[in-house]
Amino acid sequence: MALNELTLREAADKLATKEISSVELTQACLDQIAKHNPTINAFVTVDAEKALAAAQAADARIAAGNGAPLTGIPIAHKDIFNTTDMRTTCSSRMLENFIPPFDATITTHLRQAGAVILGKTNLDEFAMGSSTETSYFGASRNPWDTQRTPGGSSGGSSAAIAANMAICATGTDTGGSIRQPASLTNLTGLKPTYGRCSRYGIIAFASSLDQAGPMTRTAEDAAMLLNVMVSYDPKDSTSIQSPAPDFTQALTGDVKGLKIGIAAEYFGDGLNDEVRAAIETAQQQYQAMGAELVPISLPNSGYAIPTYYIISPAECSSNLARYDGVKFGYRCEEPKDIRDLYFRSRSEGFGDEVKRRIMLGTYVLSSGYYDAYYRKAQQARRLIADEFKAAFEKVDLILTPTSPTTAFKFGEKDDPVQMYLSDIYTINVNLAGLPGISVPCGFDSKGLPIGMQLIGRPLDEETLLRSADAYQRQTDWHKRRVHLG
């Protein structure tokens, strides 16, 4: 196996025993990027010089006996996390040349752990999309089939790992943006409990929904990366003051007696038959491992899409009001007056999908419509959260499909509503603030990956990771790799 195809655990073990060096590992990833990024378009920015310097520093740290599990590991960083030494674009013309004055808290954690940041990965503009097609820098391509999307908004991160350009990656998840791309590219993607990972220095889309998380090849890798990402941060007013365990200690391989909820609402019309079959096989495997399947009902799940597409645009319209061409970001040429500056800078700097959501958000917050839309959406959100809370009195976790289909072709979902529906199974998790993980569970007849989603109680990432890891010990779906040549 090539160095750049190693799991995070395998790479960390080889680095710790000095079987390989971080410079060798980093160079293998950089070589793969140079060879395949022109086609895959996973990275928006790559800084090979800085990456190799960080790798040399990591090797020195390991040689001195000061290494940690992430020391020397080449990682792809979603281009929504602030980095002082690299531009942070959010894949938008608005921030095309923006270099932040401070690092995101998670960026700081990665640096302190000795991780090697290879570069910044592509995403849907300001994380608004499910395919990376809204990126100002063009769509990323799925290494399993380059005519198809790697998902979104964290599609650059998922494509980078699937194409063996990085050992692991960071992502953010507002309505499924870690889990859906993980499902479409045969990866493990974890969206933690809201507030687990600091949002400080992450460019905001919808502040009550955004959450950072790991994208990796295995559940064990996700636990290792999550250990570095989770912390209480006083700079983030929504950060949870809860002790962070060593998530790798939860990986016992045992799910005997675990009660897994199966909600009929997640298996209705619109679910691809091959995806349904793969999920049902995974259910049977959990039963064979000693878990108990418990039928549950989540009838308010049907309100997920309309609720999300009222709340998230409302928050987006507020968050993106700061981009006006005055202080930072894109500025139109020769504005006639302040109104012209605002109007043209925002019209030229934002893409169509971002403008669509800003307008929708402004509308639902406007006088006369606030009560009719926004207030009702918040009430629906509470009903959805309460429904999950009641379900978790009967079960330990809930098993669903991650996405209703496998990876779709570019341009196939040109109707915005069709694109929005690709997150139908993931959005509720964000609305309720719960942790969720997508795990590889099969392939369709076209050879495209299928993912299943596990949903857990608040702050119980340990049960999710234990269950995902136990499944991966019994299956080999996650071990399958793309070989681009």
From Swiss-Prot:
One of its GO terms (cellular component) is glutamyl-tRNA(Gln) amidotransferase complex. The keyword Flavoprotein does not apply. The active site is at 78 (charge relay system), 153 (charge relay system), 177 (acyl-ester intermediate). GO terms for molecular function: ATP binding; glutaminyl-tRNA synthase (glutamine-hydrolyzing) activity. GO terms for biological process: translation. Residues 138-150 have a biased composition (Polar residues). Keywords: ATP-binding, Ligase, Nucleotide-binding, Protein biosynthesis. Residues 138-157 are annotated as: Disordered. It holds the Pfam family Amidase. The keyword Nucleotide-binding applies. It comes from the Bacteria. It catalyses: L-glutamyl-tRNA(Gln) + L-glutamine + ATP + H2O = L-glutaminyl-tRNA(Gln) + L-glutamate + ADP + phosphate + H(+). InterPro entries: Amidase, Amidase_CS, Amidase_dom, AS_sf, GatA. Its EC number is 6.3.5.7. Heterotrimer of A, B and C subunits. Belongs to the amidase family. GatA subfamily. NCBIfam families: gatA. Allows the formation of correctly charged Gln-tRNA(Gln) through the transamidation of misacylated Glu-tRNA(Gln) in organisms which lack glutaminyl-tRNA synthetase. The reaction takes place in the presence of glutamine and ATP through an activated gamma-phospho-Glu-tRNA(Gln). This is Glutamyl-tRNA(Gln) amidotransferase subunit A.
